[in-house]
Regions:
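Catalytic glycan-binding domains that act on GlcNAc-containing polysaccharides
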Residues: 8, 16-158
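N-terminal, intrinsically disordered low-complexity tails/presequences enriched in Lys/Ser/Pro
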Residues: 1-4, 11
Length: 158
């Protein structure tokens, strides 16, 4: 079976994805499910749920079909924009053999939370864990600020 990679195919896929997400958000189904999955990951890894919600908000805008192709050619997928290629050992551990599996909200939040947890263990604080989640480049402090601003918003709503 040939791989569909034409521009028209990607545009159609994004359009269908947008319609599906819009329907889920309108019905309240999507966000309720995300809240439950975030609560589960928060309890499992000891990550404040506001941090997980903030990362999801900044990374994907709560779109479980979010996709991003990076400058290095790797791809981020799903709610937490998990990068398959940069996390091969975790992919193996979770039995993920196809990057498309990362569109599953439960699996994506589980793996994303695990990455964030490992970063926290490595650096000992949430600010550096968040920075490392996006990459340790010196120029990604804007990302950290965006996430922390969202954390404040979510704290007010909980």
């Amino acid at each position: 079976m040939p791989l569909k990679t034409t521009r028209a195919w990607h545009i159609q896929r994004e359009r269908e994805s947008f319609e599906k997400v819009l329907e889920e958000v309108s019905s309240g189904k999507n966000t309720t499910n995300i809240h439950a999955l975030v609560e589960k990951a928060s309890l499992k890894y000891g990550i404040p749920k506001e941090i997980l919600m903030a990362i999801i908000s900044v990374e994907s805008g709560f779109n479980p079909r979010a996709y991003n192709k990076n400058k290095d050619g790797t791809e981020d997928r799903g709610l937490m924009q998990v990068n398959y290629q940069h996390n091969l050992s975790l992919m193996k551990e979770y039995g993920i053999t196809d990057p498309e599996q990362l569109y599953d909200p439960e699996l994506n939040i589980e793996v994303g939370a695990r990455i964030l947890y490992e970063n926290y263990k490595r650096f000992g604080n949430w600010v550096m864990a968040i920075k490392a989640y996006n990459g340790l480049k010196a120029d990604n402090w804007d990302y950290v600020r965006k996430v922390l601003n969202k954390v404040s918003e979510f704290r007010r709503s909980y």
